[in-house]
A protein has these predicted regions:
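Two-component histidine phosphotransfer core
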Residues: 1-37, 41-209, 215-221
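Generic C-terminal helix-cap and adjacent flexible tail
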Residues: 224-231
Length: 231
């Protein structure tokens, strides 16, 4: 688990460096990180850990190990910077499996997936900061009642719309709107918005709706394959 958090911290740190130094997107931080990881060694190690857990009848450990293996496989994605929506879904399913274990299953996750968009393309690891925010700044701060996260992957005309909604603490709408324009510590949503807009144009990006004690909704929009704004 610590290795997982360290990897995500390193990814987020390197994304910041990319924007500061104006490095081309195709050469951004994941290339450097992937060069340090031997996928075969990683997968073989996780496979061995899974076998040892099953042999010891530690099925919870086996479940987390398999989720971690899926997370790394979909995150590294054979060095590709652009992946399918299906890859993103698998990555988030594994990520949330790990988070649920870490949180003693004290929240639930609902999915709404349009199967017709699974082969559409998108930048990899685009959604992880959004879901992480829903957990850390949403449901983790909610003291009472059921804690829920909802993820939707839908087609909308020529676009793909991904929605992440939590029923956590929420925030004033004015603050929510600043998260996509200013680099707020611990959120990372500006980087997500910038990546989408640089790749696809200013008509795309993320929108946040929130209110105190009513949760937060983040909607991410990008074009289906082959479509983008004219520059």
């Amino acid at each position: 688990i610590n290795s997982f958090h360290n990897m995500m911290d390193e990814i987020n740190r390197l994304i910041d460096e990319v924007y500061v130094n104006k490095i081309a997107l195709k050469e951004y931080e994941l290339k450097a990180l992937q060069a340090q990881i031997n996928p075969h060694f990683l997968y073989n190690t996780l496979s061995m850990m899974n076998w040892m857990a099953i042999r010891s009848n530690q099925m919870e450990i086996s479940k987390v190990t398999l989720a971690l293996s899926t997370f790394y496989r979909t995150a590294l994605s054979k060095g590709e910077d652009v992946v399918t929506v299906e890859n993103c879904i698998q990555n988030m399913q594994a990520y949330l499996e790990i988070q649920l274990t870490m949180h003693d299953n004290n929240f639930t996750v609902d999915w709404d997936i349009d199967p017709t968009i699974k082969n559409e393309k998108m930048p990899k690891l685009l959604l992880q900061p959004v879901v992480e925010n829903a957990i850390e700044h949403g449901i983790d701060e909610k003291e009472d009642g059921d804690k829920k996260i909802f993820l939707s992957f839908r087609g909308n005309g020529d676009d793909v719309v991904i929605t992440v909604r939590d029923n956590g603490m929420g925030m004033p709408q004015e603050k929510a709107e600043t998260l996509v324009t200013y680099q707020a510590k611990g959120y990372g949503l500006k980087n997500v918005n910038d990546r989408i807009r640089i790749l696809y144009g200013e008509n795309y990006g993320i929108r946040i709706l929130s209110a105190p004690d009513e949760g937060t909704t983040v909607m991410m929009r990008f074009p289906k394959e082959g479509r983008k704004d004219e520059v």
